[in-house]
Swiss-Prot record:
Keywords: Aminoacyl-tRNA synthetase, ATP-binding, Cytoplasm, Ligase, Metal-binding, Nucleotide-binding, Protein biosynthesis, Zinc
Location of the motif 'HIGH' region: 10-20
Cofactor binding description: Binds 1 zinc ion per subunit.
EC id: 6.1.1.17
Main subcellular location: cytoplasm
Top-level taxon in the UniProt lineage: Bacteria
Protein name: Glutamate--tRNA ligase
Record flagged with keyword Metal-binding: yes
Task performed by this protein: Catalyzes the attachment of glutamate to tRNA(Glu) in a two-step reaction: glutamate is first activated by ATP to form Glu-AMP and then transferred to the acceptor end of tRNA(Glu).
Length: 472
């Protein structure tokens, strides 16, 4: 058996969205599972809509997801000479022909067909001769599609699919301006690049019989095809570049880990028993095209969030820290005076479902705050909190070995000494050192903030209570 070779071939007319990312992932996994090769190809024949920022966004998305490619990126715009060479060979061989029909004639033909309730299609007017035209007159080149029989291909996901050749008109393969068309470029690329399996969205099913006929006319091998069903949004509507689809890099910006998004995307249409959590190695080991569902998959943001929380807490903290660092920089936080990012992940991992949330909620570990959160201060920084704060401050000041255990002991001893519940000490202390009413466990929080900073903040809270008393 020849080496398996797949490709991901996005059009750079927008960012890489989740549908494209899932297609790329499936193609990548299939090649890796079979120890084959994965090709990245940029289908930029739409010269008006293809942009360099979109190409950059695709590359950024692929790199962030760690979907590495073995060949490419290839650009179709750099291969126009090759496409035109093949078209000229087809003209000479009689498998393509020049069409001189005017735009007006084709529009009238379309209107007449639609008025009769017929499917609009080219009527083959120029199929059997040039009708006294010369090659230097404006024309397109059409593929001479077979008029009898049918095209049958065995879709690796959907099973046998058949199209009658009578339903397929003669496809334009070169425009009037001399540029080759998308459907033709794809065929030549897959042939030249020796692609064995084409894995793509179900919106390409209708292109497949036309592409197979061109390959057969060229005497080229026909690859296997697998058409993946669409993804529906949380609202049940189709995700597309132009509607409701979120860029892969937006998920990065929103604080998701690539491991979480990959795990989510692989399960969005593919399954292996009832397993939900997959490492990359497990995906590669277990992935098959036959296990992909024919049905549309519904995107569920809550499930992605659950997976992200899982990976924040189960991946090595050092690995998560690499991604968290980007979000910390977005918040302009200097982490040199506070816990390391690895420590921060261990502190906040259980509480935070995204890295963005973690970066936004960690400021008090590194930066002194100007004011207390109003509701928390009103409830917990009252005159009754003065004594617990003063006693716990003095006990914290006396600690020579600054550990979370000794911090906990100081809080506990304060409660016992004053004969009050832990909450009567803990909540005022929490608001004093963090500025708010919520944080990880108080002993590890105070320990991470540091001795000098914690004591200074307790003193600030005591001043706040004094000011409050004076204003009463």
């Amino acid at each position: 058996m020849s080496k398996i070779k797949t490709r991901f071939a996005p059009s750079p007319t927008g960012y890489l969205h989740v549908g494209g990312a899932r297609t790329a992932l499936y193609s990548w996994l299939f090649s890796r599972h079979n120890k084959g090769e994965f090709v990245l190809r940029i289908e930029d024949t739409d010269l008006e809509r293809s942009t360099q920022p979109a190409i950059d966004a695709i590359m950024d998305g692929m790199n962030w997801l760690n979907l590495n490619w073995d060949e490419g990126p290839y650009y179709q715009t750099k291969r126009f000479d090759r496409y035109n060479q093949v078209i000229d060979q087809m003209l000479a061989a009689g498998t393509a022909y020049r069409c001189y029909c005017s735009k007006e004639r084709l529009e009238k033909l379309r209107e007449d067909q639609m008025a009769k309730g017929e499917k609009p299609r080219y009527d083959g007017c120029c199929r059997h001769g040039d009708h006294n035209h010369t090659p230097d007159e404006p024309h397109v080149v059409r593929f001479l599609n077979p008029q009898e029989g049918s095209v049958i291909f065995n879709d690796k996901i959907r099973g046998p699919i058949e199209f009658s050749n009578q339903e397929l008109d003669d496809l334009i393969i070169r425009r009037t301006d001399g540029s080759p068309t998308y459907n033709f470029c794809v065929v030549i690329d897959d042939w030249d690049m020796e692609i064995t399996h084409v894995i793509r969205g179900e919106d390409h099913i209708n292109n497949t019989p036309r592409q197979i006929n061109i390959l057969k006319a060229l005497g080229a091998p026909v690859p296997e095809y697998a058409h993946v069903s669409m993804i529906l949004g949380d609202d049940g509507k189709k995700l597309s570049k132009r509607y409701n689809a979120v860029s892969v890099m937006q998920y990065r910006d929103d604080g998701y880990l690539p491991e979480a998004l990959l795990n989510y995307l692989v399960r969005l249409g593919w399954s292996h028993g009832d397993q939900e959590i997959f490492s990359i190695d497990e995906m590669i080991k277990d992935f098959t095209l036959e296990a992909i569902s024919k049905s549309a998959s519904a995107f569920n943001t809550d499930k992605l969030l659950w997976l992200n929380h899982h990976y924040i807490n189960t991946l090595p903290a050092e690995q998560v820290a690499v991604h968290l660092d980007w979000h910390i920089k977005q918040q302009n936080i200097d982490t040199s005076n506070g816990p390391s990012l690895v420590e921060l992940i261990k502190l906040l991992g259980e509480r935070c479902k995204t890295l963005k949330e973690m970066a936004e909620s960690c400021h008090y570990f590194y930066v002194d705050f100007d004011s207390f959160e109003e509701t928390a201060a009103k409830k917990h920084l009252r005159p009754v909190a003065r004594q617990p704060l003063e006693v716990v401050r003095d006990k914290l000041s006396a600690i020579t070995d600054w550990t979370a255990e000794n911090v906990h002991k100081a809080i506990q001893e304060t409660a016992e000494e004053l004969e009050v519940g832990m909450g009567k000490v803990g909540m005022p202390l929490r608001v004093a050192v963090t500025g708010a009413g919520q944080s990880p466990a108080l002993d590890v929080t105070v320990h991470a903030i540091g001795k000098a900073r914690s004591i200074a903040r307790i003193n600030k809270a005591l001043d706040f209570i004094t000011d409050r008393e004076n204003q009463a």
